[in-house]
Amino acid sequence: MTGQMVAVEVVLLTQNHCSLCEHAKQVLDRLAAEYPVRITTLDLASSEGRALAAHGGILFPPGVFLDGEPFSYGRLSERKLRRELDRRHQSTRR
């Protein structure tokens, strides 16, 4: 379909008792209402979470990956993520 956005695969690395992780979940929930995203949450303490964090250079939670590439860690900027999702939408429309 013309103009349809391709879903972005989002992986959120979290840990227990992490207020920044809760903030990131809220940001992703808001943006998921506007953009096609598939969100997977991984515990940073899991073997898969540790491996992904090491691969992506994630120093502390929350870590965010977009389509397998590291996007951010620490406090997630809604503005920065929105700009990136807009950019990806524009590139799929060309």
Predicted regions and their residues:
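Compositionally biased, disordered extreme N-termini, encompassing classical targeting presequences
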Residues: 1-9, 36, 90-94
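Local sequence-structure signature of Cys/Sec-based thiol-disulfide redox active-site neighborhoods
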Residues: 2-31
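Generic recognition of short, well-ordered alpha-helical segments
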Residues: 22-26, 51, 76
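Short polybasic/polar patches that bind polyanions
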Residues: 33, 54
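Thiol-based oxidoreductase modules, predominantly thioredoxin-like and allied folds used
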Residues: 37-49
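Structural micro-motif
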Residues: 56-65
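Non-catalytic, surface beta->alpha helical segment in thiol-disulfide oxidoreductase systems
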Residues: 66-94
